[in-house]
């Protein structure tokens, strides 16, 4: 698509805030070259050729010096004239240069506006634009590789292939409607049903891959909870591979919620260690317990850690602590300190719940726990896994619902017009993923989550 509203020239700092050897400011828009030339008081270098320039203030004094790179439209990131100014990376000088660009006619870029313009000018689709942010925010190598695949168009290609099938199906249905004398033959000969079922299977295949991509992007929220001194902090340290939490023999040592971002078998995990759940008069510890309950309610997976030496029934503990939150999909029972009881580290079933015996301090059974966590999440990415977001899965879910409606209208009622309407809605839902069909408020929400300089 070609964007006609970008008559303004935007500017923003493109490097992370703070001190650094190099700081980059990006300009994009019809006046980018004119503004950069006024800043440098010299002709700009040739396209894609680095040129050393001084940067001047309004009174002619030198503010900084550095490299200037020019990218003429339409062969630039945004599809507009783009200039990158590479100066020194201190926040004071970077903000001063940015202020000078505003004086010369640029305006401040909104969050994600550079990527928004690239999308609107047809330089990338919506999935690829999102992949830029996902690559920057990747918390594991596997997530980064998947984001690169999405950026290169792997996800978009799959969606576009399904869209082509869906459009082809719509053409056949529309033909049946346009030529009513042939309607019975078109709708009843089985060809349209076969095409419809093929589209459903194709969407399902993409959904399966997208769920893996969503796990890579969003990871899993895992909470370690249990009685004080059950070994929760030791287990966090064993999983994280670093001594992060305070580990002592004093009950109630962990008084706050500790977070650790790690990768288990390639799956990004936010591991949370909570305060021990118990009655206490200590004000600080009460606050820790309040936060622990909140984390437990929001967790994707809960590891209930208990001391095998105490003879506790883990399921009774879970029922006491978590009440309505306990279910096999969200809870694993972890019997800790098996080295002190002489038990072997193993995985078993305990009344329908996964039960794992470990020794966190001795790291016995820890790898088995890691494997159980990733298997529990259904995480098994392939080499061609692409990054995906919740909105992508939601769009595919709605697509499948509309396709199911279309199938019912075809098989049960033989109602061609209703089939056509359901297929139209399915195409619109699927088209939201790449941006072929997207409301303005959806675009604003997506790009508004980006960095300012992206």
From Swiss-Prot:
This protein's UniProt keywords: Cytoplasm, GTP-binding, Hydrolase, Magnesium, Metal-binding, Nucleotide-binding, Potassium, tRNA processing
Lineage: superkingdom: Bacteria
Coiled-coil regions listed in the entry: none
Binding, K(+): 229, 248, 250, 253
Residue numbers binding Mg(2+): 233, 254
Chief localisation class: cytoplasm
Molecular function terms from GO: GTP binding; GTPase activity; metal ion binding
Enzyme class: hydrolase
Ranges where the TrmE-type G domain occurs: 219-378
KW Lipid metabolism (keyword) present: no
GO cellular component: cytosol
GO biological process: tRNA methylation; tRNA wobble uridine modification
Gene3D superfamilies on file: P-loop containing nucleotide triphosphate hydrolases (3.40.50.300), Probable tRNA modification gtpase trme, domain 1 (3.30.1360.120), tRNA modification GTPase MnmE domain 2 (1.20.120.430)
InterPro entries: G_TrmE, GTP-bd, GTP-bd_TrmE_N, GTPase_MnmE, MnmE_dom2, MnmE_helical, P-loop_NTPase, Small_GTP-bd
PANTHER family tied to this protein: TRNA MODIFICATION GTPASE GTPBP3, TRNA MODIFICATION GTPASE GTPBP3, MITOCHONDRIAL
Assembly: Homodimer. Heterotetramer of two MnmE and two MnmG subunits.
Function: Exhibits a very high intrinsic GTPase hydrolysis rate. Involved in the addition of a carboxymethylaminomethyl (cmnm) group at the wobble position (U34) of certain tRNAs, forming tRNA-cmnm(5)s(2)U34.
Name the UniProt record assigns to this protein: tRNA modification GTPase MnmE
Top-level taxonomy: Bacteria, Pseudomonadati, Pseudomonadota, Gammaproteobacteria, Moraxellales
Encoding gene, per UniProt annotation: mnmE
